[in-house]
């Protein structure tokens, strides 16, 4: 199972949010071998499943996948780099060097996917770094993206091939599972 997330969340300015709340609870903090227990406060993490945020959406999806497919490996993939795309008068998407309408830069979504891999114990395939696609470069845009002038967001067949090669290599390198 693979989850490839982040680019549409960036474009739609979905707030990053947090993976957890951290309420403070009173707990037994000391109590050994017949001693009277002593109480104190400790922060505790509770996962957030609010799909209004990027982190909450990731938690929601991965929570369901872990429940529905407990024996299957789940791989998280970072989004590839992105650049200018114009799909019509009301659908213009800027490149990753611009913050989205919420003031958040693209690389923050990339880093959030990386963090999610650790939160959910999922192998990470960092396509943002591994596949070598960089649509802000004119030569790369011409070779590996749908249209050098209007779509530096979606890979061409050549771009998909590079992504597939990176994924195949990463699966061999990071997979701790038997593949059935």
For the regions a protein language model found, what residue spans apply to each?
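Conserved active-site region of classical short-chain dehydrogenase/reductase
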Residues: 55, 59, 161
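The substrate-binding groove and active-site-proximal loops of carbohydrate-active enzymes
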Residues: 40-55, 97-101, 151-154
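Generic structural signal for well-ordered alpha-helices
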Residues: 58-62, 110
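A short helix->loop->beta-strand "cap" motif at the edges of active sites that frequently abuts
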Residues: 67-73
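Structural recognition of the beta-strand scaffold that forms the well-ordered cores
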Residues: 1-5, 9, 73-78, 123-126, ...
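Oxyanion-hole/transition-state-stabilizing segment in secreted/luminal serine hydrolases
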Residues: 1-52, 82
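Catalytic His-Asp segment of secreted/periplasmic serine-dependent ester chemistry enzymes
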Residues: 79-180
